[in-house]
Amino acid sequence: MFEFLINKLKAHPRKIVFTEGTDPRILEASARLLSGTFLTPVLVGNADEITKAAEEAGFNIRGAEIMDPANFADMDKMVALMVELRKGKMTEEQCRKSLSQANYFGTMLVKMGYADALLGGATYSTADTVRPALQIIKTKPGSKIVSSCFIMVRPSATGENEVLAMADCAINIKPTEDELVEIAVETARTAKVFGIDPKVAFLSYSTLGSGKGEDVDKMRNACEKAKAAMPDVPVDGEFQFDAAVSPVVAKTKHITSSVGGHANTFIFPDINAGNIGYKICQRMGNFDAYGPILQGLNAPINDLSRGCNALEVYSMAIITAGLVD
């Protein structure tokens, strides 16, 4: 998967903002990215502090761009644009104060074209990363919500790695039918970015009517709407998980679609199922989990775990930049 994304970035090099410019994990990942020449880190913070932190840690970040909100040349222009974007919800003084914060400043760098994408959250909360994105980058045309997916990769020593997409595992707590449709559409698009030919399964405790109830109806109805929304993508359900992934079970349950037994893109009914599901896959199925990958925004903005390591930062940077249209 990463070879696929790196080749894409080599053909079209990108710039990615890191909001925590002095963090050792960010600096280590930046040094590694710079050695590949396909992705330029844009580090937010004081240049002297960032340079000193890199030197003390032994990381070569020559070639990285450093942007400091304290002496940014186009700050007045940035403030004016943010006032316009907030449409009376924030005064000029409030915008200027917000832009002294790395997350707002970094998000505006993406908005103004100084960078293509942003990765934050190594020391900030998810809300600190997502809130500026919603206020400044906003949802793209046709999207009403921001959702998330995880890309799950199981390494193989003998052939191609197994790659799956799972959603929504982190953002929408109890999505409606229409929100599930949007989540499915966006997740199928994300899957394609990572080289997955999506076969989308709507998951439930029921397989094609074997169970009854409002929750089953919601997944079945959402599935039918998703089929209409993306007629060129195989979509089916509602399925129990085993019917979605096991050809034997799918045959036993008389599922004839190309999705049954062969699904690789999974839509969960709610965040409980999604979060539990991807973590079972990660911990007991020996899959590597990459995400949450935010979907539905006008530009790629992603959130790191505060417990991340430098390799995870490096990987998520490639993933985030790979999402740039």
Predicted features along the sequence, with ranges:
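Anion-binding alpha/beta catalytic cores of soluble intermediary-metabolism enzymes, centered on
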Residues: M1-G260, T265-D325
